[in-house]
């Protein structure tokens, strides 16, 4: 096919001296070079700003989109172009009895479609309480869902041939909510500049997924729109749920004197649901000092440096980059096909790999570690910034020293333990 695309946008703008309004709609579509290989998406974007008072402003935005993707292309790469599409009888030309590489047959008969919905909403307020004190609060919400439909007919596809038709429906839904509130105080007293920030953030994430598989269809007319036509003894059902929370408190102090001497002190506390009750919270301080030597009178007299700045900093940061529930025992149910029947395996873990059509490699990863805690990294930095020749030449020197403690990693266990691996610090 000739690749074609379309992108249409319609926008409306309006407002008063206190309110501004914007609404736009968008439709986008593209057709790939392959048959039944395309993508389309439609949605709208709404933005509103309103000054309730001269010192109090609220904002709201909402973005919604709905997409659809068909993915059936790419098979022509593996097919010799000298083979015809149809034989003399008008049927699809087959190289042999087990020909699973006919791109046109597979594209026309196999189904692989994904439908998505995405929502991004945000609301915020800014309150200038006094000239030196401002309060900001934000709420952000993100929602996404997808439904993937696949059907492999009993002819022309390997998965369908071995299973007398194979259908799959996979659903996913995720929600992310973030709340932030910060207060900022900035004041100048003669040569003294003071800035203080305090804030609180809360983040919650939850996702749910489910999957249905059906095989050995009595009638393939409706494909996976009639999953009940599959052999009930071979049907597979799966589902899962993941939920995490992160809470943070932040404090920062900035001080400057005569635009020469600068200091910053930051302290934050983070609590993550990924760790056990005794190790959910960790504290991360940091500090920095700098000296703008080019603002000193004795440096100005040299008339060489446009900038000469010495700086030093030290800070501790944290990492919680592990999957949730690693501190808990996890039990799962898996099925594998053996000698013409499905066998259920129940154990403290989950399936992470396959070994072909006749079995599933079961790597149990469910052993708990309630003592897991934050990975921390301490870093110090000493540097010099130099600019000369009317800022035409910039020179930067930096010395870093970074040390990580309590590194989060997977430890491989001996097979005799009955487990595959465990997360440790």
Predicted regions and their residues:
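N-terminal, polar/charged subdomain of small-to-medium soluble alpha/beta proteins
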Residues: 158-159
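Acidic, glycine-rich flexible loop segments
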Residues: 1, 5-9, 76-104
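Extracellular/periplasmic, surface-exposed regions of secreted and cell-surface proteins
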Residues: 41, 47-56, 60-66, 98-152, ...
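Residues embedded in well-ordered regular secondary structure
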Residues: 1-36, 72-75, 105-113, 125-128
């Amino acid at each position: 096919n000739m690749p074609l695309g379309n992108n249409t946008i319609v926008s409306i703008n309006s407002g008063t001296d206190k309110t501004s309004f914007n609404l736009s709609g968008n439709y986008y579509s593209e057709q790939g070079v392959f048959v039944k290989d395309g993508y389309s998406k439609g949605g709208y974007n709404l933005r509103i700003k309103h000054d309730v008072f001269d010192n109090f402003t609220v904002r709201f935005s909402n973005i919604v989109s709905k997409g659809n993707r068909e993915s059936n292309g790419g098979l022509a790469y593996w097919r010799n172009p000298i083979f015809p599409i149809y034989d003399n009888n008008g049927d699809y030309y087959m190289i042999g009895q087990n020909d699973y590489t006919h791109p046109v047959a597979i594209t026309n008969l196999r189904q692989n479609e994904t439908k998505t919905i995405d929502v991004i909403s945000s609301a915020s307020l800014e309150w200038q309480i006094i000239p030196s004190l401002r309060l900001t609060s934000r709420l952000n919400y993100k929602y996404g869902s997808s439904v993937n439909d696949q059907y492999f007919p009993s002819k022309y596809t390997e998965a369908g041939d071995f299973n007398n038709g194979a259908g799959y429906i996979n659903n996913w839904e995720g929600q992310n909510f973030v709340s932030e509130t910060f207060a900022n105080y900035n004041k100048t007293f003669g040569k003294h500049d003071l800035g203080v920030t305090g804030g609180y953030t809360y983040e919650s994430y939850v996702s749910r997924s489910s999957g249905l598989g059906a095989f050995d269809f009595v009638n393939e007319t409706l494909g996976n729109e009639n999953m009940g036509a599959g052999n009930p003894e071979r049907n597979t059902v799966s589902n899962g749920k993941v939920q995490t929370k992160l809470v943070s408190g932040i404090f920062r102090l900035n001080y400057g004197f005569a635009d020469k001497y600068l200091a910053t002190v930051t302290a934050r506390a983070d609590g993550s649901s990924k760790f056990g009750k005794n190790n959910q919270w960790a504290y991360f301080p940091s500090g920095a000092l700098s000296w703008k030597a080019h603002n000193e009178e004795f440096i100005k007299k040299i008339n060489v440096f446009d900038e000469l700045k010495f700086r030093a900093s030290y800070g501790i940061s944290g990492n919680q980059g592990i999957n949730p529930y690693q501190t808990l025992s996890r039990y799962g149910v898996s099925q594998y096909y053996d000698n013409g029947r499905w066998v259920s395996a129940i154990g403290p873990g989950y399936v992470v790999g396959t070994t072909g059509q006749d079995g599933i490699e079961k790597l149990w990863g469910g052993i708990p570690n309630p003592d897991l805690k934050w990975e921390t990294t301490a870093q110090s930095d000493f540097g010099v910034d130099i600019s000369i020749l009317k800022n035409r030449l910039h020179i930067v020197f930096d010395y870093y020293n970074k040390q990580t403690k309590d590194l989060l990693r997977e430890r491989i266990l001996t097979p005799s333990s009955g487990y595959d691996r465990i997360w440790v610090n």
